[in-house]
Amino acid sequence: MEKFVLSLDEGTTSARAIIFDRESNIHGIGQYEFPQHYPRPGWVEHNPEEIWDAQLRAIKDAIQSARIEPNQIAAIGVTNQRETTLVWDKDGKPLYNAIVWQCRRTAEMVEEIKREYGTMIKEKTGLVPDAYFSASKLKWLLDNVPGLREKAEKGEVMFGTVDTFLIYRLTGEHVTDYSNASRTMLFNIKKLDWDDELLELFDIPESVLPEVRESSEVYGYTKKELLGAEIPVSGDAGDQQAALFGQAAFEAGMVKATYGTGSFILVNTDKMVLYSDNLLTTIAWGLNGRVSYALEGSIFVTGAAVQWLRDGIKIIKHASETEELATKLESNEGVYFVPAFVGLGAPYWDQFARGIIIGITRGTGREHLARATLEAIAYLTRDVVDEMEKLVQIKELRVDGGATANDFLMQFQADILNRKVIRPVVKETTALGAAYLAGLAVDYWADTREIAELWKAERIFEPKMDEKTRERLYKGWKEAVKRAMGWAKVVDSAKSN
């Protein structure tokens, strides 16, 4: 009987389930969206029951579309939107909505903590204190949900990120992995344990915390009434770390970029815990008794800039049109677009930056705007890669995400980086990474060497641009960024006058 691995890919807007075989081929997919809830401006929540319902339906659809029986599934891997914070009781019943990673309700609280404890938090967790991470969200829940802190003190509350909630519902086990724990701002990435000083700082009782395990081991077995079989749940990693694993980036210096609404770039630093002023240090995964680390750069707006061309100023109807428009021009004739709609992420970290389009003349048309948008994505990626290069030597960039279908963008990315950009055959690298981690735990795959041999390039984009042109274009980009930075402060100052 042929066996398969099931990957659960729980994102910010939808829950997906994908079934892979030993050669990494996809046999079945299920996907269901779930609603976002916005109770106040800047607040973002999910209903955990809606997440669970969407995930369970996606699993059943994937099994059905693959035309297999549940007992043909050798293992289940979980990957998830990171940082999103949930609390539930011992019966698995949610005690409040999930507070989503995008939610800014704790921004002021974190700013106060950052002023006094920012350096200490960065040294312990590798993270720059921000409302993005789980610690302040959990503190808010304990302080604001009636009766929750009292229940927590009695050991009746369980906290976790989305992976932990799904694994608890599937198996009854309260666990997470190193990669997800490292995004809570409560986990000491050197000691590999919850940090007492941080728990005290955020006033969080240890009893609510899950057990932290490796990213590839059997955490438990699915309850038979759910799927009709007891299947080992044996892989767990946050979405960006799972994508790094799915790209078979197992050695130091191997880097991947995921192009989505924003972009995330991770470089494997292996056993080295490296610190950068402008990048996050995080755990990539725990495997076979050792932990691998990574540096991460988060870019807030990339694909969202293309969506703005479509939905905001309506100069395109489909994202794919940008490639055709961009290739109509031999050059962009000095037009730059800095898509700092919500500030700039790595390596600038300027929340007061705002979007600008600069270099416009009477001859500027929608071709220039489309091209400037795609070029901005590549420039922003180079900004992060250059920062990584200060600490780690980088030879090539492996890419995934929807925008990788755009050949103009991929070629320009190779040109502006002066490095190969490699697009893999299997585009579902996040789900594939979780599947690999699950399969390794049950000997479905032997080791990472076998997985590295399975990874195949669909196309390699070689740099073609001469150095003089490349550096002239990039210098123009850096000048454009300077003009975008701090713009919200300029506007506020003008208002107050």
UniProtKB/Swiss-Prot annotation:
ADP binds at residues 12, 16, 261, 303, 402, 406. It catalyses: glycerol + ATP = sn-glycerol 3-phosphate + ADP + H(+). Gene3D superfamilies: 3.30.420.40. It comes from the Archaea. It is an enzyme of class 2 (transferase). Its EC number is 2.7.1.30. One of its GO terms (cellular component) is cytosol. GO terms for molecular function: ATP binding; glycerol kinase activity. Glycerol binds at residues 82-83, 132, 239-240. GO terms for biological process: glycerol catabolic process; glycerol metabolic process; glycerol-3-phosphate metabolic process. PANTHER family: GLYCEROL KINASE (PTHR10196:SF69), SUGAR KINASE (PTHR10196). Homodimer. Belongs to the FGGY kinase family. This is Glycerol kinase. It comes from Thermococcus kodakarensis (strain ATCC BAA-918 / JCM 12380 / KOD1).
